[in-house]
Each structure stands twice: as structure tokens, then as C-alpha cells.
């Protein structure tokens, strides 16, 4: 399931994050430092060092915004969110086809983290650069994603995906992973659809007993499938 979440960050937050990233040249490192064997062969970008104060400061801003976003909570059912990272692609940079690693180690904690969902939060307007589309492959084919600054895309971490070469300008983004309460994508999709239906029924003044029954079904399924 691919889900677009608009306006995770407001324009002022985007400006602040962009300004900090563009003013912090010394914190940028080769993006291959965090790539696995497969990704290292096809990854050509830069990212902010994970242990830098900039990464921690800006990552906390992103996490605070996610906590206040009901669409993100409903779609991802987050158990843990990997500390947000930040990357940039200049001209001729790209990230070839790959699949994200299934398990990551959260830096400095020793905690192993299962990557159920991948997230890209765009920090550059689409007309600021050419190329740089996030291409995500699923059973329905290939999907090209290039969103407004402040918007985010969620997709299964098991997906084959790539970032196409930049031919003009610069692409800035935050990227991270979510370990969901429900690891199976099909189950999360069903719960997400049910949650949206429940919210719609509440807005339309549906019979309360029917809404309560559907809400009970949602929570019983969540109880059955939750992995904590």
C-alpha cells in the first residue's frame, strides 16, 4: 500500500529544515556509509551524518510532526520510528533499484529494528529539480512519486524502489522507517480502510450501534494482529 500524507510539515517548518541543511556543509557525508552490500553498489547521494547534532535536532522536528498527524498514525500504526535521516541528490546522483534491509540497528542503542514501512518526506519543491522521482514497484506496476515539499509517501519496505538520476537542481528529503504494530501490509491496509470508514460514519451521523460494532471489529482485529 502506497499512501501519500500531505502537509506533514508546514511551509515554515520546511524553510527552517532546508535552511539548516543548506547551511551545514560539514555534516554531509557519502550516503553509502549506511548502505548494505546491495545498496552500496547503486547508491550515489549524500546524507547528514546520523550522529550529528543537526540530524538529532531536525529529526526531533520530524518526529514531533508525525506524532500530531492522525493520517500517519492510522496508516502506519507505528510501534517505533527510526530516527529520521536526511539526504540530498545533486546533478547526476541517483539510487538504483534496491530493497531496504529487513533489520537495522538504531545507532547508539543496541536496539534491533524491523523495517516494515519506508517513508520519504520531501523537502524540495518538485519544480526545483528535474529527475529524482521515487519509483516504487508493487503488484500493480511501477509508481513514480515526486511530491510537494512537506508531503510524505509511505510504502512497504519490502518494495523494490529507486530514485532516478537528477538532471537539474537538488533534491532534499528526510527518510526513515517504521516498525508497525502490524507487520503484514495486507492487514495494515484492511485496518486503515476500516478506520477511514469508521471516521466517515461518525461524520455522516450513522446509526451509533452500527458504528460501535464496526469499531469493535477494528479493535478486535488489531488485538489479534498486533505485534508488541
For each of these PLM feature ranges, what is it?
Residues 1-85, 190-228:
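Non-heme Fe(II)/2-oxoglutarate
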Residues 70-174, 178-187, 191-192:
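Catalytic core of non-heme Fe(II) oxygenases with the double-stranded beta-helix
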